[in-house]
């Protein structure tokens, strides 16, 4: 990953006063501290002792043996927390997780969209034995639990005895340290589940102090019905519920965020439901061809035509990966139809037919990037005080969100557009995110808390990742500390791996 020259130069100057990546006590001097609470920033010295923040004060006298770092002109923030990450796909093979650390992420919540490692006890043990550069917390995947009980026959509602076994498995996973239940109700493994099934499982997560995070059942024409379902789950299961990667993903709903969403938060408050959400700062998404036809009639021409139209049209849906013919990656469905000499509908049906084996084999034969959200709605979600930030990204995925989400918010939406203040953005990346998950010792800069920190230049921070180069590192993220150790220094990964497998403490409510 080639870093821009300006970043390397600034980073080199920044590091001159301390040994790179040293696991030593550190004094950060005269930083602009944005402490994660949402309050005004202030200039201060911050002392790190071991893996904890020891002192925060206007001026601190250096101690013998302490590494000094001049942070004048730079922002010091808590480490960024990604509340919806798919970086667990590949984390065991890539322990440095550079696409995450280089954008300031110190903690990520994985096991999303209904898909989690199983059993979590064993997965956590592997992380304990060979730590990564990031902290990892996990949800329990609804589809994962369904698959353990129903096997390949999960394309139907569950039976009472199956639901009972799912509840037992979920309880065991929560006891192993999971932070809640996730679902991907728009995907094959879960779309056949009833709302009552999800409620009964959410009750188990809630009883253990967990949360429910949902890729809702429809993000297109029926998105508000899907939000209604989520509110019902929260109301009846009595636990916090979170709309993940919230979007209004079809042209007929564009512009409705400001009109419709306040009523949902108000309704939730009246009904005693703790409603939350998270968002990534892009108008395009990354998923599968099959998600375009939400009732799964993949070979019904009328349904396919509607699915294409509801997602911005075939010209806005691009193959990111296509195993049967890799040369098609990067082409839109419109372009593929022209190559094949068929209609866009026929091209879609052929693409799905040639990758249907993925459903049985569990492989990843295809993926798409679709542009179907409006910038107006994305900006509204980004600015809303109850909506945290997520990448929904992978370590090495086709969507630039995996490498650019957090710098993009700071550069594009804070500095360039003024959609929200720096303090508000950092709060949503840190303190708010920690409170949503239930992390009590991270997400803020205060004495006694874990020293997960990000040092960045507010005048230059920006994302550089694109669809063409989805892993391009950002500009302006100069240093990242995890548990008192530098995992990024001078804009470069250090190779240190102090990350923890985070388990939910028993009885701690989010």
Which positions does each model-derived feature cover?
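Acidic, glycine-enriched loop/beta-strand segments at the rims
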Residues: 33-45, 363-373, 378, 420-426, ...
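N-terminal signal peptide c-region/cleavage motif recognized by signal peptidases
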Residues: 15-19, 136
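Divalent metal-binding pocket/active-site signature
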Residues: 172-229
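Histidine-rich, glycine-flanked metal-binding segment
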Residues: 24, 33-79
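Histidine-centered catalytic micro-motifs
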Residues: 80-90, 212-218
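Polyanionic/metal-chelating signatures
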Residues: 123-127, 132, 143-161, 165-166, ...
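C-terminal cap of metal-dependent C-N hydrolases
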Residues: 299-301, 310, 371, 379-386, ...
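Divalent-metal coordination cores built from histidine and acidic residues
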Residues: 74-76, 80-85, 93-183, 202, ...
């Amino acid at each position: 990953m080639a870093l821009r020259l300006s970043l390397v130069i600034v980073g080199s100057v920044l590091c001159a006063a301390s040994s790179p990546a040293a696991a030593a006590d550190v004094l950060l001097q005269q930083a602009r501290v944005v402490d994660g609470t949402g309050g005004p920033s202030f200039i201060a010295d911050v002392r790190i002792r071991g893996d904890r923040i020891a002192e925060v004060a206007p001026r601190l006298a250096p101690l013998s043996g302490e590494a000094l770092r001049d942070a004048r002109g730079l922002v010091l923030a808590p480490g960024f927390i990604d509340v919806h990450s798919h970086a667990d796909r590949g984390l065991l093979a890539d322990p440095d997780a550079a696409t995450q650390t280089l954008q300031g992420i110190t903690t990520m919540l994985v096991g999303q969209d209904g898909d989690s490692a199983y059993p979590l006890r064993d997965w956590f043990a592997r992380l304990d034995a060979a730590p990564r550069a990031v902290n990892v917390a996990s949800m329990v995947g609804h589809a994962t639990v369904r698959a353990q009980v129903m096997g390949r026959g999960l394309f139907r509602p569950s039976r009472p005895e199956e639901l009972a076994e799912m509840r037992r498995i979920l309880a065991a996973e929560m006891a192993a340290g999971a932070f809640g239940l996730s679902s991907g109700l728009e995907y094959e493994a879960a779309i056949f589940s009833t709302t009552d099934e999800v409620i009964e499982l959410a009750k188990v997560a809630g009883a253990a102090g967990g949360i429910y995070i949902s890729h809702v059942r429809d993000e297109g024409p029926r998105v508000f019905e899907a939000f209604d379902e989520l509110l019902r789950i929260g109301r009846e299961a009595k636990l916090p519920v979170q709309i993940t990667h919230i979007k209004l993903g079809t042209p007929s709903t564009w512009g409705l965020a400001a009109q419709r969403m306040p009523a949902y938060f108000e309704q939730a408050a009246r009904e005693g439901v703790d409603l939350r959400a998270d968002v990534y700062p892009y108008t395009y998404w990354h998923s599968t061809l099959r998600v375009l036809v939400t009732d799964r009639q993949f070979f019904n021409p009328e349904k396919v035509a509607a699915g294409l139209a509801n997602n911005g049209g075939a010209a806005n849906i691009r193959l990111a990966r296509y195993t049967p013919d890799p040369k098609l990656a990067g082409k839109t469905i419109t372009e593929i139809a022209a190559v094949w000499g068929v209609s866009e509908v026929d091209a879609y049906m052929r693409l799905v037919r040639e990758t249907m084996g993925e459903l049985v084999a569990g492989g990843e034969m295809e993926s798409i990037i679709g542009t179907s959200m409006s910038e107006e709605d994305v900006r509204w979600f980004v600015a809303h005080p109850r909506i945290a930030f997520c990448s929904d990204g992978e370590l090495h995925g086709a969507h630039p969100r995996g490498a650019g989400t957090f710098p993009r918010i700071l550069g594009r939406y804070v500095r360039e557009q003024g959609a929200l203040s720096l303090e508000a953005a950092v709060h949503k990346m840190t303190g708010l995110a920690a409170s949503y998950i239930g992390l009590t010792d991270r997400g803020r800069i205060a004495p006694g808390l874990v020293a997960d920190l990000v040092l960045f230049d507010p005048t230059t921070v920006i994302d550089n990742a694109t669809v063409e180069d989805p892993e391009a590192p950002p500009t302006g993220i100069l240093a990242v500390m995890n548990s008192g150790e530098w995992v990024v220094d001078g804009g470069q990964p250090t190779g240190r791996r102090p990350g923890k497998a985070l388990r939910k403490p028993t009885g701690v409510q989010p």
